[in-house]
């Protein structure tokens, strides 16, 4: 991108950015500067100010907040099949947790990415905010859903609730989340009609995110610790 600087006594006093000859003339005081060139050219700008590149630039040049391991998927490999093959899915399609998406998800909370939210049964694995964000991306959550997912995980990962027992029993047991208050209205969650989530993204994905954390972080997979027959 054309950039002209005016320097006096070793210090910059003015600059002209972009392809616009009148600005060049004003800066230099030279009439007809570049007269053999077009007066202006549209779309001449730095990609660093392109709004569509914000997430990519934050990932590449911002402070690295992510500690999770990275997994490369080859160009010839279907990423959906790759995630399912690695056991990250509950059987339904999932959203690839790219660095950009996980960073965007973390914008939904002010809690540090490395804060331990809970020790997740049945394998009793410490789970950070970042790990919850990864699974929220997989589930299809929006960033504004993350606080509810975090609260739900804290609610079930304690001795009183006994999530380990829920996951290890042979009976067909599954937790139900009840969300109420201003955040329920802010997220547009179903209430009164369709409370079991059909067609509502918040209702569908918040519970799914919790289930994926229990599965992917806590290790509760059918046929392993999860012995439910229904």
Predicted regions and their residues:
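Non-catalytic, surface beta->alpha helical segment in thiol-disulfide oxidoreductase systems
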Residues: 6-41
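Intrinsically disordered, low-complexity, compositionally biased regions/tails
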Residues: 22, 47-49, 169
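Structural micro-motif
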Residues: 1-5
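Flexible inter-domain linker/hinge segments
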Residues: 40-76
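Non-transmembrane, aqueous-exposed alpha-helical and coiled segments at domain scale
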Residues: 61-230
């Amino acid at each position: 991108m054309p950039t002209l600087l005016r320097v006096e006594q070793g210090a910059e006093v003015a600059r002209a950015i972009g392809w616009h000859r009148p600005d060049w003339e004003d800066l230099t005081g030279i009439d007809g500067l570049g007269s053999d060139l077009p007066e202006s050219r549209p779309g001449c700008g730095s990609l660093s100010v392109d709004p569509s590149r914000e997430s990519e630039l934050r990932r590449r040049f911002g402070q690295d907040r992510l500690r999770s391991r990275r997994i490369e998927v080859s160009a010839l490999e279907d990423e959906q099949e790759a995630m399912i093959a690695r056991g990250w899915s509950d059987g339904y399609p999932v959203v690839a947790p790219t660095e950009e998406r996980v960073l965007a998800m973390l914008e939904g909370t002010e809690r540090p990415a490395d804060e331990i939210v809970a020790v997740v049964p049945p394998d009793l694995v410490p789970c950070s905010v970042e790990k919850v964000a990864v699974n929220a991306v997989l589930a299809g959550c929006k960033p504004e859903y993350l606080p509810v997912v975090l609260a739900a995980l804290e609610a079930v990962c304690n001795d009183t609730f006994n999530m380990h027992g829920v996951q290890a029993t042979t009976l067909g047991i599954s937790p139900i989340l009840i969300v109420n208050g201003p955040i329920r209205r802010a997220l547009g969650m179903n209430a009164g009609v369709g409370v079991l989530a059909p067609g509502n993204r918040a209702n569908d994905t918040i519970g799914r995110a919790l289930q994926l954390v229990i599965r992917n972080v806590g290790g509760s997979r059918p046929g392993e610790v999860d012995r439910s027959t229904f």
